[in-house]
């Protein structure tokens, strides 16, 4: 009789502990989801602002007399339009939700990879800009020379700015994922008729 009562108490205790762990996990997921959403929003606001500045600077191409500057500002304006197309949908899209920390951690890892790939492309853009400016030196035609210099400068400026942006977003997403992963180490309880067993989940 006493053993049965003890077993019942174990089951009740186990149920209460599991419920408490699930409640804590739900609260953590909500908090970290909000943090991820705010991080993404800040990033896209920055990208939208940078895009708007570059589009606005395109007007300088209409008033400058330097063909090199015309090419530089025109290319910047083109970059701005592309960045705007990327940033605006992300700002207005419905935020993602997650049912548990594992889903959130997986999505953060995927986001890290995207920013890491983008950072690699940024380095390529910078290299292309340097290459264009070097190529300009071999051109005899003045306008052609100025065109390559203008486009090259734009690629270097845009590539550098985006490299800092992507590197920052990569690092912030990684930092959040590490924090989420650390919390995934939970203590669960397994109840048998005679014993409690502790299981550490990583």
Residue positions per predicted region:
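Alpha-helical transmembrane segments of polytopic membrane proteins
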Residues: 46-50, 75-80, 119, 155
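Helical transmembrane-bundle signal
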Residues: 51-61, 80-90, 125-132, 159-169
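Juxtamembrane "helix-exit" motif on the non-cytosolic side of transmembrane helices
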Residues: 59-65, 138
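Membrane-interface helix-boundary motifs at transmembrane edges
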Residues: 64-71, 142-144
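Loop-to-helix transition at the N-terminal end of transmembrane alpha-helices
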Residues: 67-83
